[in-house]
Amino acid sequence: MSEFSQTVPELVAWARKNDFSISLPVDRLSFLLAVATLNGERLDGEMSEGELVDAFRHVSDAFEQTSETIGVRANNAINDMVRQRLLNRFTSEQAEGNAIYRLTPLGIGITDYYIRQREFSTLRLSMQLSIVAGELKRAADAAAEGGDEFHWHRNVYAPLKYSVAEIFDSIDLTQRIMDEQQQQVKDDIAQLLNKDWRAAISSCELLLSETSGTLRELQDTLEAAGDKLQANLLRIQDATMTHDDLHFVDRLVFDLQSKLDRIISWGQQSIDLWIGYDRHVHKFIRTAIDMDKNRVFAQRLRQSVQTYFDDPWALTYANADRLLDMRDEEMALRDDEVTGELPPDLEYEEFNEIREQLAAIIEEQLAIYKTRQTPLDLGLVVREYLAQYPRARHFDVARIVIDQAVRLGVAQADFTGLPAKWQPINDYGAKVQAHVIDKY
């Protein structure tokens, strides 16, 4: 349980005065992890400069760096870590030039995060909760006994402050590491979705089930011990109610209660969020594997799965009936209200007679397309016919050609619902919009 006794300006001035800074590129961080690993294998926890150089040599080889300047670069790295308070250097007058190095609390904290805290262990968590339960019970018994201020400080406040609070912080850190692991699993699933769908399903299910199981183990362990922990905290709180001079204990107990409630609450909320994510991934991946033909939907789904926690989503699909282009074959070819008066050349001729003559000729000529099963492009055919007639007859001839053509068959492209391109059919700006007739 962190408690700051200094204000923000004081902390800023202190950090500036001491020139605190941390800069750890990947090679330097790897060197620090190597030092921590080798240091953990030693009983005395001390390392000589030669051992640090050997560790640096391993890191340098792994990064394929030159070995010619290994001594200079190792010395620079060691001095840099001493300056950043990651290593402590101890020199002796008896062994001049042969310094001893030990990891600082900062160095241990960084390496502990990357090495030890990355692995979740139900047994480790159970042991931590067992220790907390024992400390809280002893503190509660001491609070019930009562005593002077020294008694409260030594037997109640100190165990709560320096044992219970630190273990609560460790459990909170475990939860935050699990949050990072959830994000890593999401990234792994996104990478799997870039591969073959059917091969990805089993891998995704394995990742999802492992994460769900780990979260459930963590929460079950917390809930099993949570009631006892809260009960002992309440015992301590009740004991302080009759003492006006124990505000520091009461405030600490309140902070611990809030921390424990927050840990248990976030554990359950994290499980609920993951269950929702798990359910959606299973449902939509199995649906999408049959729907995805051109990999377009896969790309959108990968992005949606990746950002699910930020933007939750649901899939709704509909199967609408096809839209058919229904033509009235008996529709009158010409409407006086639309076309206006007859051209002068046709003023003294009966329109129906001309229509029948042209229709018979055009029908005979267009029948060749049906006989040969050749696609009929109305744009090209109408343009060829209009080139044979004067401009005054273009409108009527075009209507006749189109009318006869649509009697022969239909265009399969009409069923796609996509509009056809406009094609010019004469030199005066007239255009027609029609798909190629390919089904007779």
Swiss-Prot record:
One record GO biological process: DNA replication
What NCBIfam families does this protein's entry cite? PRK05260.1
Q: What is this protein called?
A: Chromosome partition protein MukF
> What does UniProt give as GO cellular component?
cytoplasm; nucleoid
UniProt similarity note:
Belongs to the MukF family.
Enumerate the Pfam families for this protein: KicB, MukF_C, MukF_M
Query: Which residues are connected by disulfide bridges in this protein?
Result: none
Q: Where in the cell is it found?
A: Cytoplasm, Nucleoid
Function field: Involved in chromosome condensation, segregation and cell cycle progression. May participate in facilitating chromosome segregation by condensation DNA from both sides of a centrally located replisome during cell division. Not required for mini-F plasmid partitioning. Probably acts via its interaction with MukB and MukE. Overexpression results in anucleate cells. It has a calcium binding activity.
Principal location listed in the UniProt entry: cytoplasm
Q: Organism, per UniProt? A: Salmonella typhimurium (strain LT2 / SGSC1412 / ATCC 700720)
Outline the subunit composition.
Interacts, and probably forms a ternary complex, with MukE and MukB via its C-terminal region. The complex formation is stimulated by calcium or magnesium. It is required for an interaction between MukE and MukB.
UniProt superkingdom: Bacteria
Q: Which GO terms describe its molecular function?
A: calcium ion binding
Q: Residue ranges of region Leucine-zipper?
A: 208-236
Keyword tags:
Calcium, Cell cycle, Cell division, Chromosome partition, Cytoplasm, DNA condensation
Could you read off the lineage of the organism from its UniProt record?
Bacteria, Pseudomonadati, Pseudomonadota, Gammaproteobacteria, Enterobacterales
